[in-house]
C-alpha cells in the first residue's frame, strides 16, 4: 500500500491514464517507504500531450500579455497558500529536511513565476526607420510547444523555472519530471489549471529517460529545456538537433571551485564552504566541491570547517531541527559511497564522515555522513568528477595565478566563487574564472533576477533573468513601405 496511491499523467487540464501499461515506483529516501506507483507515458501519450499543447497554446497566445500575467500571478498565490502541504510532499519525495523545503523549494519556484508574470507585458519588438517612407518593425512571437525535462534534486522549483518564462512568452510546456521525484510536478499542473491556464498549456508526462528521448525527438516540439547530467544532456541535444533543429537550453553538471585567499575572513569562508558542499546533502549542481585554500591559512580554515561539520544536524526530514537529510535514491547512495572509497584509495586524507549512516532510524534510509577530504590532488577522481553528494575536497595553493589556472582546469564551468577582503583581487579573480555563475564572499543564492547557466560542458543558454525570455521567443521582421513601390523590371 502506497502513501499517495496511483499517479497518472496530466494532459489537457486533467489527470489522464497512460496507455503504456507500465508503471514505476517512487520511495521515501529517508524510510524506504513506497510513496506512489506512477504510470509511465508511451509514445502515443506523448503525441496526445503535444496535440493538446498545440491546441492550448493557440488559445494562450491569443490572450493579451496582461491576461497571461494575471493568471500566472494567481498561480503564484496558490503556490504560496499551499506552501506547507507542497513542502511536505517535496520532503517525502526528495528526502530534504522540512525546514529546507518550506523555506526554499516552493518559495523560490513561486518567486520565478511572479518575476516572469511581471515581465509578460514587457515583451516587445523594435521599430527601425529605413527611409522617410519605409521602416522595419520586429515582433517577438512564442515558439509554440516547449518541453521541459527536470532533475530529481529540485523537482517543483525546476518545473517552475522552466515553465514560467515559457508560459509568460505565450508558449505551452510539456514537462517530464525525474522518475526519482515525480510527484510535485503534478501538483503544479493542478495549480496552473485552477489559476486559469488553458487546458494543454502545461502537461506532465511521467517516465524514465525513454520518455525524455521521445520529447527531445518529437517534431511537434519547438524547444527542449533540460536539467541534469552532462552525458544525458548531450543525448538530449543530439536528438533535439537531429530531429527538427529545436532550440535547446541545457543546465548541466559542475565541479565548481571555491577559492579562499589568505586575507579572507576564515569564519565566513568556513560558513560558505560548508553551505556550498552540504546544503541539500550535497545534491546541488552548483556546489563548490573543489575548495582551494591558500597554504598560509589552510590549517586554520580546516579547523573551522570541521567544527561546523560537527554541528550539522543529520536526522529525520520531518524534524524541524534537521538540516541534513538522506540522498534521493539508493542509486545515488551507491555512487557517492563509491567516490568516497575512491578518495580513500587514491590517498586523500579523510577528515570527517566517509561512511553510510546505519544506526537507529538511519538504517532504512539513504544517509551518508557529511564527508571532508584533505590533502587532495587535482588528478583524484573526487576532485575531477561530479559526485553530487556531501563530499568536500580541500586543496592548497600558493599564488593567485596558480589557483585560477587549477580552478579552470576542468571540462565544467557552471559556478565559481572567491572569499577575500581585497575587492580588487575579488573582481580580478572572478573575471578570469571560466564559470557562468560566480559569487564573491557568498555562495548559492540564485534569485529570479539572476541568469543561471554554465560555460563549457556545464550548459547552453540560461534560466532566470530577463535574457531567458529571448530564448522562449522568435523574432519576426516586417518591412513596411508607405511610398510608391519601385519595380525592378
Curated annotation (Swiss-Prot):
A GO BP annotation: glycine betaine biosynthetic process from choline
Chain's role: Involved in the biosynthesis of the osmoprotectant glycine betaine. Catalyzes the irreversible oxidation of betaine aldehyde to the corresponding acid.
InterPro entries assigned to the protein according to its UniProt record, in alphabetical order: Ald_DH/histidinol_DH, Ald_DH_C, Ald_DH_CS_CYS, Ald_DH_CS_GLU, Ald_DH_N, Aldehyde_DH_dom, BADH
PANTHER family reported in the protein's UniProt record: ALDEHYDE DEHYDROGENASE-RELATED
Residues at which K(+) 1 binds: 26, 93, 180
Pathway named in the protein's UniProt entry: Amine and polyamine biosynthesis; betaine biosynthesis via choline pathway; betaine from betaine aldehyde: step 1/1
Complex formation: Dimer of dimers.
Documented EC number(s): 1.2.1.8
Residue sites binding NAD(+) per the record: 150-152, 176-179, 229-232, 253, 285, 386
Keyword line: Metal-binding, NAD, NADP, Oxidation, Oxidoreductase, Potassium
Residue numbers carrying Cysteine sulfenic acid (-SOH): 285
Cofactor notes: Binds 2 potassium ions per subunit.
Active site: 162 (charge relay system), 251 (proton acceptor), 285 (nucleophile), 463 (charge relay system)
Catalytic activity: betaine aldehyde + NAD(+) + H2O = glycine betaine + NADH + 2 H(+)
GO MF entry, a single one: betaine-aldehyde dehydrogenase (NAD+) activity
Family that this chain belongs to: Belongs to the aldehyde dehydrogenase family.
Native organism: Burkholderia pseudomallei (strain 1710b)
Entry cofactors: K(+)
UniProt-listed CDD domains: ALDH_F9_TMBADH
Superkingdom field: Bacteria
Top enzyme class: oxidoreductase
Full protein name: Betaine aldehyde dehydrogenase
HAMAP family named among the record's database cross-references: BADH
Binding residues annotated for K(+) 2, in chain numbering: 245, 456, 459
Pfam families per the UniProt record, alphabetical: Aldedh
Site positions (Seems to be a necessary countercharge to the potassium cations): 247
Amino acid at each position: 500500500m502506497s502513501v499517495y496511491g496511483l499517479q497518472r499523467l496530466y494532459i489537457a487540464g486533467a489527470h489522464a491514464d497512460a496507455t503504456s501499461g507500465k508503471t514505476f515506483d517512487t520511495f521515501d529516501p529517508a524510510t524506504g517507504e513506497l510513496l506512489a506507483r506512477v504510470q509511465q507515458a508511451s509514445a502515443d501519450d506523448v503525441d496526445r500531450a503535444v496535440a493538446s499543447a498545440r491546441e492550448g497554446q493557440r488559445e494562450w497566445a491569443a490572450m493579451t500579455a496582461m491576461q497571461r500575467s494575471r493568471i500566472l500571478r494567481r498561480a503564484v498565490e496558490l503556490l504560496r497558500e499551499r506552501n506547507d502541504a507542497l513542502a511536505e510532499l517535496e520532503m517525502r519525495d526528495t528526502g530534504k529536511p522540512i525546514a529546507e523545503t518550506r523555506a526554499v523549494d516552493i518559495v523560490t519556484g513561486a518567486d520565478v513565476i511572479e518575476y516572469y508574470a511581471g515581465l509578460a507585458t514587457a515583451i516587445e519588438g523594435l521599430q527601425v526607420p529605413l527611409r522617410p517612407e519605409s521602416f522595419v518593425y520586429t515582433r517577438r512571437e512564442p515558439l509554440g510547444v516547449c518541453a521541459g525535462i527536470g532533475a530529481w534534486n529540485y523537482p517543483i522549483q525546476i518545473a517552475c523555472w522552466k515553465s514560467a518564462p515559457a508560459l509568460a512568452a505565450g508558449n505551452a510546456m510539456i514537462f517530464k519530471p525525474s522518475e526519482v521525484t515525480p510527484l510535485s510536478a503534478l501538483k503544479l499542473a493542478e495549480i496552473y489549471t485552477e489559476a486559469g491556464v488553458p487546458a494543454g498549456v502545461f502537461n506532465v508526462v511521467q517516465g524514465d529517460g525513454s520518455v525524455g528521448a521521445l520529447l527531445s525527438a518529437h517534431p511537434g516540439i519547438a524547444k527542449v529545456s533540460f536539467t541534469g547530467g552532462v552525458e544525458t544532456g548531450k543525448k538530449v541535444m543530439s536528438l533535439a538537433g537531429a530531429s527538427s533543429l529545436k532550440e535547446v537550453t541545457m543546465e548541466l553538471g559542475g565541479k565548481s571551485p571555491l577559492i579562499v585567499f589568505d586575507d579572507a575572513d576564515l569564519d565566513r569562508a568556513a560558513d560558505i564552504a560548508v553551505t556550498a558542499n552540504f546544503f541539500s546533502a550535497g545534491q546541488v549542481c552548483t556546489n563548490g566541491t573543489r575548495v582551494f585554500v591558500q597554504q598560509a591559512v589552510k590549517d586554520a580554515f580546516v579547523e573551522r570547517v570541521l567544527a561546523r561539520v560537527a554541528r550539522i544536524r543529520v536526522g529525520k526530514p520531518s524534524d524541524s531541527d534537521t538540516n541534513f537529510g538522506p540522498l534521493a535514491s539508493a542509486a545515488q547512495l551507491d555512487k557517492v559511497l563509491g567516490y568516497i572509497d575512491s578518495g580513500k584509495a587514491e590517498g586523500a586524507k579523510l577528515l570527517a564522515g566517509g561512511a553510510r549512516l546505519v544506526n537507529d532510524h538511519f538504517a532504512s534510509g539513504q544517509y551518508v555522513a557529511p564527508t571532508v577530504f584533505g590533502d587532495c590532488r587535482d588528478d583524484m577522481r573526487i576532485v575531477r568528477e561530479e559526485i553530487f553528494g556531501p563530499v568536500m575536497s580541500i586543496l592548497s595553493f600558493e599564488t593567485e595565478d596558480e589557483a585560477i589556472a587549477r580552478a579552470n582546469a576542468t571540462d565544467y564551468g557552471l559556478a565559481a566563487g572567491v572569499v577575500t577582503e581585497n575587492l580588487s583581487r575579488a573582481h580580478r579573480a572572478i573575471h578570469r574564472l571560466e564559470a557562468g555563475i560566480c559569487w564573491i564572499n557568498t555562495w548559492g543564492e540564485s534569485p529570479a533576477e539572476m541568469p543561471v547557466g554554465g560555460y563549457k560542458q556545464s550548459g547552453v543558454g540560461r534560466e532566470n533573468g530577463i535574457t531567458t525570455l529571448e530564448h522562449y521567443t522568435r523574432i519576426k521582421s516586417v518591412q513596411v513601405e508607405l511610398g510608391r513601390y519601385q519595380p525592378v523590371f
